[in-house]
Amino acid sequence: MTLRVVGNTTRDIFYLTQNFPAPGESVLAAERKEDVGGKGFNQAVAAVRAGANVCFTTAVGNDAPAAALRVAIDAVDGMVASVLTAPFRTDESVIMVSDDSENAIVSTAACARWLDVRSLAPTLAAVTHGDMLLMQGNMCHETTATVLRQARAGGATCVLNPAPLPQDAAALVALADIVVLNLFEACTILGREYANKDTNTITAAVSSGKMLQAQSGAVVLLTLGSKGCVILSDAEPIEIAAPRVVAVDTTGAGDTFTGWFCAGRMRGLSLEDAAREAVGAAALKVTRSGTGNALPSRAEYTEFVGG
């Protein structure tokens, strides 16, 4: 059985700042760093480091940064990758990280959106019963929807992390078996108000998660940052608390969670046990700065949880 991840790869440029600039304000960064990232890449690497058998399909540009991304992808032990060349500049993300470990991200997605059903035909042809397909929200709606339908028809369990939120995300959620998202994303899909992170409570998560689960029929995992996650299915809601840590950089925490959760399910873990491992791995990730290079390994996770 194989976890097949279809998604983006980006050149990540980090600016470490005391605070985010207000509209019209300029701020100086204390430091600039680069890493390899993108939700697709991060989730694929997270799953590999958790022990999954991963095939990753992505696209990069036809420019100099693409060469560095290809080297980074090839260097991931245990991951089989198909890296296509799009006729654009390589996708990149500019990530601001504040002193209180929060982040703000702006990304390009021309290469990710260039991927279509035709270019993904070999990936779909390789899907067999028992595989798992993992997608995100960077690609075109039509492509994402078609790939989810075809993979599901081929016997794969389809997992969707609809971030960044695509247009008509509700229609994509309905095509997935499992949906991983945060409370803001869930509220947006449902058309509910999300005031700020202070409303990021277990009660709000259970309420919104139940609505989304009933609307879509999918198992819903709502991530709540330092509060852990909530699982909504046909059974009673399951709440999983996160270990207490001192956060340095929350970038990639959701991707770590998603990759580790999928890896756990591929190993035969229950929803609860897979999510518990994923919450722990995400907590470890936020103690580190960066994206692809900061994703924890199985050995690091085991040491972290005291196993």
Model features per residue range: what roles?
Residues V45, E92-M96, A104, G228-L232:
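Short beta-strand scaffold segments in enzyme catalytic cores
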Residues A72-P87:
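A glycine-rich helix N-cap at a beta->alpha junction
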Residues M132-A204, K227-C229:
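Conserved beta-alpha-beta core of the PfkB/ribokinase-like small-molecule kinase fold
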Residues Q167, N196-G307:
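Conserved phosphate-binding/catalytic region of the ribokinase-like
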Residues M1-A59, A64-V71, V246-V248:
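Glycine-rich phosphate/adenosyl-contacting loop at the front of the ribokinase-like
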Residues T85-P87, I95-M132, G137:
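Conserved phosphate-binding/catalytic loop of the ribokinase/pfkB sugar-kinase fold
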Residues A64-V76, I95-S101, I105, L172:
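Active-site-proximal loop->helix
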